[in-house]
């Protein structure tokens, strides 16, 4: 799915791709995707810039002592912060295993050109009903939107689609029904480079507050955005996509994803092969 995202981003006008990877999978990422980008050009005809940023424990602040037994990465805020040295322009953030659809990239690229250098960002929101899986629960950033801007966001960690079509968050053994047409975040964010200072500050505060023995907690991007919203330090415009998101949350999703991609090739959304 990452190849489709890169293809769509280049068509929209983006000129650089930064892969954020664990050092031990760099070779795999190069083989599966990075090497195929050699010779690719941007919409303006210039060579596509491709970079690799490592998310590892070495990039954590010096004051933090890693607890014994910690192997889990520190989450999406830390991941994006690891790309700081490679990003000096407005940028978008995506998940590698999600398909966001063509129009979303055009929309966010245009919006990034309108943002102030600091204090403003953007996101693409999707209807909840278009982002659930029939094969198990999913986690989503539930968005609260007023006048086209995000006013709050919280992570619903266990959203389930039931046979009768209802959707509910079933975390903690409770069942809290959710509106099928409510907007959710799929981690498709648009930021200005000034956000890195705020990310660094938030990650520092997150790490200082962790119990010394904590080995699983993650510093998540939606939580950082929500914190900045509460403090009045960030404004987030919400762009809407009626397109159907799809992704590889579960192995059983693979067949449906393959069918949908085949349909998109057949109807001309994509050429016969992305590597031509």
Stretches found by the model and what they are:
Residues 2, 83, 97, 127, ...:
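Residue-level signal for inorganic ion chemistry
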Residues 1-93, 100-105, 114:
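Conserved N-terminal catalytic core of the sugar/cofactor nucleotidyltransferase
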Residues 57-63, 129-131, 159-161, 244-246:
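A short acidic, often aromatic-flanked loop/helix-cap motif at beta-alpha or helix-coil junctions
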Residues 51-53, 93-95, 123-127, 240:
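Short beta-strand segments
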Residues 102-189:
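Conserved core of the sugar-phosphate nucleotidyltransferase
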Residues 61-73, 136-141, 252-256:
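Short, surface-exposed amphipathic charged segments that create phosphate/polyanion-binding patches used
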Residues 29-33, 108, 199, 257:
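Hydrophobic packing residues within well-ordered alpha-helices of enzyme cores
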Residues 146-147, 153, 160-276:
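Conserved alpha/beta core of the MobA/IspD/sugar-nucleotide pyrophosphorylase nucleotidyltransferase superfamily
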């Amino acid at each position: 799915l990452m190849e489709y995202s890169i293809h769509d981003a280049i068509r929209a006008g983006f000129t650089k791709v930064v892969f954020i990877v664990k050092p031990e999978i760099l070779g795999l990422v190069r083989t599966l995707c990075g090497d195929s980008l050699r010779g690719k050009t941007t919409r303006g005809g210039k060579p596509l810039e491709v970079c690799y940023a490592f998310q590892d424990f070495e990039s954590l602040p010096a004051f933090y002592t890693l607890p014994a037994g910690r192997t889990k990465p520190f989450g999406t805020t830390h991941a994006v912060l690891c790309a700081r040295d490679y990003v000096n322009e407005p940028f978008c953030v995506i998940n590698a295993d999600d398909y966001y659809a063509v129009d979303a990239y055009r929309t966010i690229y245009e919006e990034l050109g309108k943002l102030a250098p600091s204090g403003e960002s953007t996101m693409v929101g999707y209807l909840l009903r278009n982002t659930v899986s029939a094969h198990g629960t999913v986690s989503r950033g539930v968005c609260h939107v007023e006048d086209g801007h995000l006013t709050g966001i919280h992570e619903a960690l266990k959203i389930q689609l039931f046979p009768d079509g209802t959707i509910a968050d079933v975390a903690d053994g409770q069942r809290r029904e959710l509106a099928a047409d409510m907007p959710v975040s799929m981690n498709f964010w648009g930021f200005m480079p000034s956000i890195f200072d705020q990310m660094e500050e938030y990650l520092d505060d997150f790490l200082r507050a962790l119990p010394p023995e904590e080995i699983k907690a993650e510093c998540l991007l939606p939580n950082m955005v929500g914190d900045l919203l509460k403090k009045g330090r960030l404004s987030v415009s919400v762009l809407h996509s009626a397109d159907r998101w799809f992704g590889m949350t579960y192995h059983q999703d693979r067949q449906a994803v393959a069918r949908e991609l085949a349909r998109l090739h057949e109807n001309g959304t994509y050429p016969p092969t992305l590597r031509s």
